[in-house]
Design a protein with these regions (language model features):
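Flavin-dependent oxidoreductase catalytic core characteristic
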Residues: 1-226
Length: 226
């Protein structure tokens, strides 16, 4: 995660390249521009993290329809949280970040669930936002949000520099953690969809080899639930 955080950062690579530029005049100009952008980026992420937390991610522009827009806003909040924590971790730990495997692993978990939740939302809209798929979409979102907050919470509670961890907690979770795992009622709705033939299950298995033959247990289970 540490190497990826540097390579994917919108400003760090520009700062590093400017520092290595043999032309001192051009280097100072480029570095000042990148540093100013980096500072603005950090302040923006800190403000967005706090604002989304205290407002419950209910405000701000977001794509999607009335059903999915709150999910997109939640992803925007967690993306700001990840960017803020990554920036602070790189600033204070530097090259030691890649040796802090628990911290980098938890931040990597946040990134993974952001990708997965974003992919689920994109597929939902690409397929025309079918009504029958909403329980599957909701379960995926609530599960990812819960996993993201669990990883963020663990990273903050165990941050190597404790006062910094407390300060970050005040920005990321000023009102405490709110995301809960999918409840039993939603679990039952999803289970019912998966255990009976329907269009939602057909879409979920689209492109998957489901022929019920000897060496394909997935196909055999699908035939049992037909």
């Amino acid at each position: 995660f540490g190497q990826g955080a540097i390579l994917c950062h919108p400003w760090v690579m520009k700062e590093m390249k400017a520092a290595q530029d043999p032309d001192r005049t051009a280097a100072l100009e480029s570095f000042d521009e990148a540093l100013a952008g980096h500072v603005r980026y950090g302040i923006s992420n800190a403000f967005r993290s706090f604002w989304f937390a205290i407002t419950g991610s209910k405000f701000g522009s977001a794509p999607g329809d009335d059903y999915t827009r709150p999910f997109f806003r939640k992803l925007d909040r967690y993306a700001a949280n990840l960017a803020l924590m990554s920036d602070v971790s790189m600033l204070l730990l530097g090259g030691k970040l890649k040796f802090k495997e628990s911290l980098s692993g938890r931040l990597g978990d946040v990134l993974s669930h952001l990708y997965m939740a974003g992919a689920v939302l994109k597929r939902h809209h690409d397929e025309g936002a079918p009504e029958a798929d909403k329980p599957l979409l909701a379960w995926s979102m609530y599960n990812s949000f819960h996993q993201i907050e669990t990883a963020l919470s663990a990273a903050l509670r165990n941050f190597p520099i404790r006062p910094v961890g407390w300060a970050l907690w005040a920005l990321v979770f000023p009102l405490g953690r709110r995301a809960e795992a999918p409840g039993d009622r939603l679990n039952h709705r999803v289970a019912s969809l998966l255990m009976s033939p329907n269009e939602a299950r057909d879409r979920l298995g689209n492109g998957v080899f489901l022929t019920p033959c000897e060496n394909n247990p997935g196909g055999r289970i699908d035939s049992y639930l037909a």
